[in-house]
């Protein structure tokens, strides 16, 4: 069964609803320029109130190794998701302390080949945009297909929503899917009906 991560969590209500609806993971964005930014203290508060066995992931962009680790341990994270220009070497050093998920922006086949450089880690494929962060737009999933089996753990993101997630899973066969804006009322506030529907369709329930 495909795993589901609900990202851009900013409040306990949305986090608990996501988990109760079947989400395997929740994501906190620690990139200060994001509309979904949450402070490490707020993330810690939410994290401490979640049930056991829920995966807590923090999103970072070009932070120092020390800063990532400080926030990760303070907020009670299980993994960090790196959306910047972090090198393979940086990821390896960080991975000695906490699980690393490397996000790579995709618009064409050469981007997928670049993502393969990180395949020793779980790799999240997102839609390529100028700057950093999500776009809420879908990329051409077909560019992934020739390389799909070279990724050990492939996480699909970028413009997913309850209307397209079944098709995305059927086509790409990811280990997990990641959604944020596709289940929102406004940035940082989830639409609970959409969250429930997304998880149900992603897991084939």
Swiss-Prot record:
Q: What class of enzyme is it?
A: isomerase
Q: Which reaction does it catalyse?
A: N-(5-phospho-beta-D-ribosyl)anthranilate = 1-(2-carboxyphenylamino)-1-deoxy-D-ribulose 5-phosphate
Keyword annotations of the record: Amino-acid biosynthesis, Aromatic amino acid biosynthesis, Isomerase, Tryptophan biosynthesis
Family (UniProt):
Belongs to the TrpF family.
Native organism is: Thermotoga neapolitana (strain ATCC 49049 / DSM 4359 / NBRC 107923 / NS-E)
Specify the pathway. Amino-acid biosynthesis; L-tryptophan biosynthesis; L-tryptophan from chorismate: step 3/5
Name recorded for this polypeptide: N-(5'-phosphoribosyl)anthranilate isomerase
Q: Give the Gene Ontology MF terms in alphabetical order.
A: phosphoribosylanthranilate isomerase activity
Gene Ontology biological process terms from the UniProt entry: L-tryptophan biosynthetic process
Q: What is the name of the gene encoding this protein?
A: trpF
Keyword Ligase assigned to the entry: answer is no
